[in-house]
Amino acid sequence: ILAAPTWHKSPNWQMSMQHNAREGGLFVVSTCMAIRKDDIPDKYDFKNLYPEGRDWINPGNSCIIDPKGQVIAGPLEAEEGILYADIDLNTITEAKRMFDVVGHYSRPDVFNFSIKTNQ
């Protein structure tokens, strides 16, 4: 399980997390900060830099992704909460069979990796 805390909230971040899940054959828990304008105390002047009527400074978008890259919980957008998901550890094996990043199914008859040590 990869825990990936972030401030980032865009759909691109979620796609990156889906890629990480597939490439690593692992579950990803993407925890994104959700913060409202009202969460900032009035004593901080920078609070006024946010436009009027904007409730959320960062809407969060936390999610849980399985090893096949599928979102199995969330995204939790513009709300506070806790995400839960039942995970099947067999999914890890299935995912790693489909996408082998370390090359267990590489073809030694086609590809050869060697290092010259005499130079």
What are these regions (language model features)?
Residues I1-D86:
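CN hydrolase (nitrilase-like) catalytic-core segments centered on the catalytic cysteine
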Residues I92-Q119:
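Cysteine/selenocysteine-centered motifs that mediate thiol-based redox chemistry or coordinate metal-sulfur cofactors
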